[in-house]
Amino acid sequence: MANREKSILIGNGFNINFGGKAYTNDYIIKRIVFNARANRYEALFSGEISGDEIANIFTRLATWANDISAGKYDAIIPDTERPILEDFKARYNWELSHYYEVGLEDWFFILHVYFLQNADIADNWSSAKQGFERMMLDAIYNDGDIQSLYKDMGKPVKRWLLGFSKVFTLNYDNNVEDLIKRPVFHLHGDFRTLANSEDPHTLWGYMRHQKGDNLEIPAGLEHCFCNALFDYAGEYKYKIAYAFEQGERGLKALEKSGIPLQYFPAPIEDLIRAHREHPDLV
């Protein structure tokens, strides 16, 4: 009988096992607020918002979780997002007492509802979401400590992982590949790979570069601009990422997918045109 390939999927519990509470949800969220109050994120926002203001946004928005669960904003949720709303309510069927009880990706849904309720500032949605993403990535990165967890994993863990022909991970860190010295499949992106929006060798990055939208990445915060997939609507982010990998065929399918236009990095026709002109870009 031929040897069957064995695969493994690694999640955040793997990091918690070796890094402890520092990588649990509540500690990550607490770290964002601590870092904000220490003015760590001034460079991310070009000094347009203070650390105390960022901290207050988190504590105020957390109260929206209870209101969303209570049905206060049901009327403004689009029909296409009803399943997301019901899933949120099912998971938060109790009253939150602290801001750090809100799950990482659930912050994006709360923020989304906030902008639905305040439609007059809807143009700020993308930049606000991007700011949240980058702060969360920084808090997970934990001054780079997360990238050193492999040093504490030891030979038994290395031998165990080498017993799998393919290793998949939901985590952004690069500990497993540093430990086993083999490629690892990052399903949600990783800290060492630049985001498509910032990489001029990708379709999205090329279009931004052509428009002069390139962003200067602050020194020491490079990890905040990686290709991590971070969103409350998981189905959307995977469909969009997959479509980019499939080129024009994928982009055309994306146009008929029913995904709200706000999730696209640019109008579909612009993406298709850029791909035709530069088929080497993905």
Predicted regions and their residues:
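SIR2/sirtuin NAD+-dependent deacylase catalytic core
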Residues: A2-V282
